[in-house]
Design a protein with these regions (language model features):
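C-terminal and late-domain segments of enzyme folds
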Residues: 2-34, 46, 51-53, 135, ...
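Catalytic nucleophile loop
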Residues: 87-90, 113-132
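A glycine-rich, hydrophobic loop/mini-helix early in the fold
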Residues: 41-42, 48-93
Length: 236
């Protein structure tokens, strides 16, 4: 059965890096029966830090030592093939997907997750778990081979969702940007995840998790946005 934890963000308000979701990750690993197994960490989204720095930051902040970054393996595909759990950190989604394709890991990760290997990721790591990365919030700093992503969750994900316009900003709101996507891709569904929320995937079912009662938004072309409250589940 497919097992995934897709986190909107690495931080929530002033709680610190991965602090708000640390227990969620612990519970996820225990529930999936891999608490004592090594987690394969994929740091490719972390453009502004080295792979070593990113790995150490995650180990320190999660207070979980059994993490090994994929950049330390001589054969990345084999590392994925042998992984007992897979984690992808946040950063720049364009860079992340570029390297996943460069090392031929997209299909490899898909196959492992379909086979029941637990997957968790935050921000860019949640975005690429969707059908494509086309609802990312990130700068296109490098061009991946394709926008097609891991399709663990077969719809679009927009992490870090914030409603409305920031004071002094005269560009489009997040809702307007996502509406643009739906105008061009009318059969797609978008699930917008506010800060501090997550989707817990079990098979073909998802449950909304959250620090507060911040609902996940389900958006479809020319339809009223549906609010899915924390604790509610849905089939996809």
């Amino acid at each position: 059965m497919k097992q995934a934890l897709l986190l909107s963000s690495s931080s929530y308000k002033d709680t610190g890096y991965l602090r708000h979701c640390k227990n969620w990750i612990y519970e996820f690993l225990k529930e999936c029966g891999v608490w004592d197994e090594q987690v394969l960490f994929i740091p490719y989204a972390g453009v502004r830090r080295t792979n070593d720095e990113y790995e150490q930051k995650v180990i320190d902040c999660l207070e979980y030592k059994n993490i090994a970054s994929i950049h330390k393996f001589s054969d990345p595909k084999r590392a994925v093939a042998e992984a007992k759990a897979i984690c992808i950190g946040g950063g720049n989604t364009f860079a992340l997907l570029y390297y996943l394709y460069k090392f031929d890991l997209v299909e490899a990760i898909k196959q492992r997750v379909e086979a029941g290997v637990p997957y968790f990721g935050w921000s860019a790591g949640a975005n690429v778990a969707g059908s494509t990365m086309m609802t990312t919030n990130d700068m296109p700093i490098i061009m991946p081979k394709s926008f097609d992503a891991l399709n663990i969750f077969p719809h679009q994900i927009n992490p870090h969702f914030i409603s409305g316009k920031i004071a002094g900003h005269n560009g489009e709101s997040r809702e307007e940007r996502l509406e643009e996507f739906l105008i061009v891709n009318q059969k797609s569904l978008i699930y917008a995840l506010p800060e501090g929320t997550a989707l817990r995937i079990k098979g073909e079912n998802a449950t909304v998790m959250g620090m507060e009662n911040s609902p996940v938004l389900k958006m479809a072309y020319q339809e009223e946005t549906e609010l899915i409250k924390v604790g509610e589940s849905f089939k996809f």
